[in-house]
């Protein structure tokens, strides 16, 4: 488990993923951004080039966000400066009870 530089990044999301999050999971992109940028207790579990981000929105919603770290080539194709860390949102959903328990334990409120 890691905490740190992954949260100092830019975020990108495809139109299709954005639509799916809104219609299937009832999640807005700004909620995902709150988890990534604003939750001081957020943490990630890494698997290959993907990260499962555990976090909470200002309204108290517990979200599990799956992101992929983009390669240098992908970053340049999107028009970001070289060396910028960019996360591509793959999906997000509400945490289940076990995941909320893990989050709260890490946060120190379990």
What are these regions (language model features)?
Residues 1-110:
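Ribonuclease/tRNase effector modules and their secretory precursors
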């Amino acid at each position: 488990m890691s905490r740190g530089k992954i949260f100092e990044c830019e975020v990108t999301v495809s139109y299709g993923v954005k639509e799916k999050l809104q219609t299937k999971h009832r999640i807005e992109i700004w909620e995902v951004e709150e988890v990534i940028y604003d939750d001081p207790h957020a943490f990630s579990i890494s698997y290959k080039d993907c990260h499962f981000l555990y976090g909470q929105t200002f309204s108290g919603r517990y979200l599990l966000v799956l992101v992929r770290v983009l390669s240098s080539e992908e970053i340049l194709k999107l028009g970001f400066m070289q060396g910028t860390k960019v996360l591509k949102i793959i999906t997000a959903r509400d945490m289940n009870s076990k995941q909320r328990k893990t989050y709260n334990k890490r946060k120190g409120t379990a």
